[in-house]
C-alpha cells in the first residue's frame, strides 16, 4: 500500500480527497498540509510515496513547491488542479498525471491504479523533475513562529547545522526545509564549504588562513568558512588566478 500526503489550502478539498483515497483501499493517507511550506516540511519528515498537490495556493504554488523538492528523494506527485483544458493538455504532454477539481472518484481510482503499477520510482521521478522550475526566485522559511518568504536575491549565505538548514540575509536568519543541495542547484549560491553556500555578491573580503583554509567576511560582517576543496574554485569565480 502506498502512503500519501495531501497538500491543499482548502480544508474541504483536503478532507474530501483524503476520504476518496481511503476508499480505494490502496492508499494510506499519513498526513496533510494547508500550504506548500508546511507541506515541504511534512514531505521531508514523513517521506510519503505519493503527494497529491494543489497548484493554486497562496505564497508558494504547487509548481514552485515541485521545484523545491530534493530530486534524489522526490515522491510521486499528482497535481490537483482547476486549470482549464489547455493547461491539462500540457500536463498530459509531459506524461504527468493530474486530478481535476472537483475530484471524480473513478478518475482517482485510475490514478491510484496507475501509481500502484508504476514500473519504477526513478522513471516517474524523471517526469516530475522535468516539470520542476530550474531556478528558485524565493525560499520559504520559518522564523520566530512565522512563515517568511525570502527573496533568493537577498540571501547572502545558507548553512546547515545539527538543527537544520538556515538562510541568512542582511536583515534576518530563518530556517528552511530545503536542502543545501537544492539551494546550490537552483539558486546562485555557491558552495564554499561542506556546510555552507555563499552569494558571490555578498562577499566583502576573503581572509587566507593557514593550511590552505580561508574565511569569507560578508558585507554585513558575517563570517563564513571556506575549505581547501572550494577555495580554488571560489578564486576563479572572482577572477583571481592565484
From Swiss-Prot:
Q: Identify residues that carry 4-aspartylphosphate.
A: 54
Cysteines engaged in disulfide bonds, as pairs = none
- In the UniProt record, which is one GO cellular component term? cytosol
Q: In the record, what terms sit under GO molecular function? A: phosphorelay response regulator activity; transcription cis-regulatory region binding
**Response regulatory domain residues:** 3-116
Q: Which GO terms describe its biological process?
A: regulation of DNA-templated transcription
Q: Which residues fall in a coiled-coil region?
A: none
Q: Per the database record, which ranges form the HTH LytTR-type domain?
A: 139-240
Q: Which keywords fit this entry according to its UniProt record? A: DNA-binding, Phosphoprotein, Transcription, Transcription regulation, Two-component regulatory system
- Give the highest taxon in the source lineage: Bacteria
Kindly provide the name given to this protein in its UniProt entry.
Uncharacterized response regulatory protein VV1_0503
